[in-house]
From Swiss-Prot:
This is Ribosome maturation factor RimP. Transmembrane segments: none annotated. GO terms for cellular component: cytosol. It is found in: Cytoplasm. GO terms for biological process: ribosomal small subunit assembly; translation. PANTHER family: RIBOSOME MATURATION FACTOR RIMP. It comes from the Bacteria. Belongs to the RimP family. The gene is rimP. Its main location: cytoplasm. The lineage of its organism: Bacteria, Pseudomonadati, Pseudomonadota, Gammaproteobacteria, Vibrionales. The keyword Cytoplasm applies. It comes from Aliivibrio fischeri (strain ATCC 700601 / ES114) (Vibrio fischeri). It holds the Pfam family DUF150_C.
Length: 151
């Protein structure tokens, strides 16, 4: 998570929470004049289009006042979806036993991409069973983590 993403998360957690939603996480993708702020929200009863619209209006209002992003961007608000991104240690704990796809910032054993089942989370270390071996990953070295849907 970048410094800007951390700042945005702290700024948006309370307003999104006040609407009754969980701010699962967010990502800011810089692409010149096509930059995108993706905000993922959830609710115990699921997320519907109306929920995303309501959260989008609230987030837009906060962003207009605080103005933390200096470039033009598009705001996308959605549910985490089937390939739910994992941002926090609590997310890994919630999905122990589920398959996850990881992309690392720095390679481990000459690999940046890993896929396996979440075994446990201990502090800032997540243990994933990959091909029968338990591998430990520092959360600080994970650039992207998503659940792998089962069909």
């Amino acid at each position: 998570m970048t410094g800007l993403e951390r700042q945005l998360t702290e700024m948006l957690e309370a307003p999104v929470g006040a609407l009754g939603y969980e701010l699962v996480g967010l990502e800011f993708v810089r692409a010149g004049e096509h930059s995108t702020l993706r905000v993922f929200i959830d609710h115990e009863n699921g997320i519907f289009v109306e929920d995303c619209a309501e959260a989008s209006r609230q987030i837009s209002a906060v962003m207009d006042v605080e103005d933390p992003i200096t470039v033009a961007y598009n705001l996308e608000v959605s549910s985490p979806g089937l390939e739910r991104p994992l941002f926090k240690a609590a997310h890994y704990q919630q999905f122990v036993g589920h398959e996850v796809s990881l992309v690392l910032k720095m390679p481990m054993n000459n690999r940046r991409k890993w896929k396996g089942d979440i075994l446990e989370i201990n502090g800032e270390i997540v243990t994933v069973t990959v091909d029968g071996n338990n591998e430990e990953f520092a959360l600080s070295n994970i650039s992207k983590a998503n659940l792998v849907p089962k069909f």
